[in-house]
Regions:
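Glycine- and other small-residue-rich loops at beta-strand/loop junctions that grip anionic moieties
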Residues: 86-87, 177-180, 286
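Conserved phosphate-binding/catalytic region of the ribokinase-like
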Residues: 4-20, 169, 186-201, 206-216, ...
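Conserved beta-alpha-beta core of the PfkB/ribokinase-like small-molecule kinase fold
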Residues: 47-52, 56, 126-134, 138-145, ...
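Short, well-ordered alpha-helix to beta-strand connector turns
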Residues: 26-27, 80, 170, 217-218, ...
């Protein structure tokens, strides 16, 4: 039984994506946003506290990793892209550890400002399982140490000036907003305008409270919950209608919606909607999902790929994260992405034998 025309196009597109991923061509990506530390504490939760109905975690291991925009920078580096990261950290242990970790992986850190007396955001997740059962870990608790005050004016102005100067020759600009004070109204307006003038496409992962900063942005990333919230807020009857209204209101080119087990959908101002279904059966976690999609889109833009190819690549990147069993797999890697795209190609070939 042969492939239909649609299946043949899918097969050829995926095969070309695999070829592109295997190439060693590099490209420059400018990245600005909040930088933080992620800490993971693993253990067993066999008992409840005798004085309160809360589980007791017996720690077995812990690990630290960079998060937010720094997490995106690691993904870009893994994909063979040159990431120029701009953000701030505090003059504390966590901040210095972030810089050291990034430098150890070859990520450029000259754009990270160390702000005196500022607290570096640290998000700690406690992951537990029952020792007597063979079961995946579950998130038990998360607690945050953070400072979301605006970055001091002097540091913020310098940060955006450096980022604007660095746009020359960039294939894309990524803005990663976690609400920690780096992405500002004035800074975003100047940076996005400079990118537009330089024909550098902008990818933005905005807070829903910061959509006003994203007018005229090329690529916007939402999770499905965010689109549903906006649907209710603007009174649209469907997610597709909400996406269309948001694209018109903010003059976006593309709205990328990540829907977990439902896959990835790209709504566009001037093109047909494209949907890539998720091929996973067992979804394990979602940490780093938007970061992975941003990396995949940046890679796609650096190769001049179309929206259809971009949707397939972003979906495969999300599948890598959704199926991750280890915390070190929460960062998108080129090897994992090549393997995932290859699985889609193989499945198409096998199903049509």
């Amino acid at each position: 039984m042969g492939m239909t025309d649609e299946e043949a196009m899918l097969h050829d597109t995926l095969s070309e994506l695999k070829r592109q991923l295997r190439s060693n061509d590099s490209a420059k990506i400018v990245l600005i946003g909040d930088v933080m530390m992620d800490c993971y504490i693993h253990g067993y939760a066999n008992n409840l506290n005798s004085r309160a109905p809360v589980p007791v975690l017996r720690e077995t291991s812990r690990e630290e990793d960079v998060g937010a925009a720094a997490h995106v920078a690691r993904g870009l580096r893994s994909m063979g892209l040159s990431s120029h990261l701009f953000g701030v950290v505090g003059d504390d242990t966590a901040g210095l550890s972030i810089i050291e970790s990034l430098e150890a992986e070859g990520v450029t850190t000259h754009g990270i400002a160390i702000v005196e007396d500022r607290t570096t955001t640290v998000k700690t997740r406690m992951l537990a399982s029952r020792e007597s059962l063979i079961r995946d870990e579950q998130l038990l608790l998360r607690w945050d140490i953070e400072e979301d005050d605006p970055v001091p004016d002097e540091a913020s102005v310098a940060l955006y000036e450096q980022a604007i100067d660095d746009l020359q020759g960039a294939s894309a600009l990524i803005a990663s907003d976690y609400g920690q004070g780096v992405i500002t109204d004035q800074g975003a307006e100047k940076l996005f305008s400079a990118a537009k003038k330089g024909n550098v496409p902008v990818i933005a992962d905005p807070k829903l409270t910061g959509l006003h900063r994203t007018e005229n942005v090329d690529w916007i990333l939402f999770q499905s919950q965010g689109l549903e919230l906006m649907r209710r807020r603007i009174g649209a009857s469907t997610g597709a209608e909400a996406a269309e209204k948001l694209i018109q209101q903010y003059n976006w080119n593309h709205l990328v919606v990540l829907s977990g087990e439902a896959g990835v959908t790209i709504y566009s101002a001037d093109e047909e909607t494209v949907h890539a279904p998720c091929g996973l059966i067992d979804l394990r976690q979602m940490i780093g999902l938007i970061d992975a999609a941003a990396v995949a889109i940046a890679f796609s833009l650096s190769r001049g790929l179309d929206v259809y190819s971009t949707a397939l690549l972003a979906n495969a990147a999300c599948e890598c994260i959704l199926g991750a069993e280890r915390t070190d797999a929460f960062v998108l890697s080129k090897d994992d992405l090549i393997h995932r795209v290859g699985e889609h190609v193989w499945n198409l070939q096998v199903s049509k034998r």
